[in-house]
């Protein structure tokens, strides 16, 4: 099990760090009182590997409870529970600027000068910083750069390259565009099998419909171009930290054209080694002639 305790100065990026760890598959808990760490660790270690990556945010918001952290860490060590400490730091100037931009009050100086709160927090965190396994200074890091550093330290080998999950989703425009779409493609420019009597009651999964749709040169050309576009976009989305991509392909009812095109794109991406899922949102709705809720 990998057990990471995330701490550091207010405004240094702990919230962003915990989000990045969550993207890497960590079970994350924010602002857990330090006195609860031992019981929480014991519960996690008793899951027989069902939970194998844990990240906790412990910071000065815990007030007087924060001072109990060393007793809890010593207990973990005596019990043989391995843990790592990640400390987020930044310069006083950068922290002051971030607090002013966000218009937030420093937790140790709610009615006073931000700098005084920062200096007080530095003093209280000095010992935990000295015990940290990894220290990241975010003063000059953009959000993307912090994410890359977190990934470098805490991802499994090769996870950064395979993290993006693509979902190819077919749908019918008459039932509405999927609200979670990242990319939407309209294939209603292709001839509609609905108006062919022998194809009307079939779906885009059936060979007779697939053969009809794929017989048009426009279909093949569109699929080739869409595949090329996705092969270009996927690594660039990944580089910017995107972890999921929803590619929605729509026709009128989501039963014929969009299903065939979505299946074809799914198979091509899968053959190219991508992590990809397929979902036909409206195929059953259109068969029943119902309305999408």
Swiss-Prot record:
The protein's matches in SUPFAM superfamilies, at most eight in alphabetical order, are given as:
P-loop containing nucleoside triphosphate hydrolases (SSF52540)
Q: Where does ATP bind?
A: 8-15
S-S pairs: none
Q: Where does GTP bind?
A: 59-62
Query: What GO annotations for molecular function exist for this entry?
Result: ATP binding; GTP binding
**Keyword annotations from UniProtKB, A to Z:** ATP-binding, GTP-binding, Nucleotide-binding
Q: Does the keyword Nucleus apply?
A: no
Q: At the top level of its lineage, which domain of life is listed?
A: Bacteria
InterPro entries attached to this UniProt entry? P-loop_NTPase, RapZ-like, RapZ-like_N, RapZ_C
Family, similarity comment: Belongs to the RapZ-like family.
Instruction: Describe the function of this protein.
Output: Displays ATPase and GTPase activities.
Q: What PANTHER family does this protein's entry cite?
A: RNASE ADAPTER PROTEIN RAPZ
Q: What is this protein called?
A: Nucleotide-binding protein CKL_3564
Which organism's genome codes for this protein? Clostridium kluyveri (strain ATCC 8527 / DSM 555 / NBRC 12016 / NCIMB 10680 / K1)
Print the organism lineage: Bacteria, Bacillati, Bacillota, Clostridia, Eubacteriales
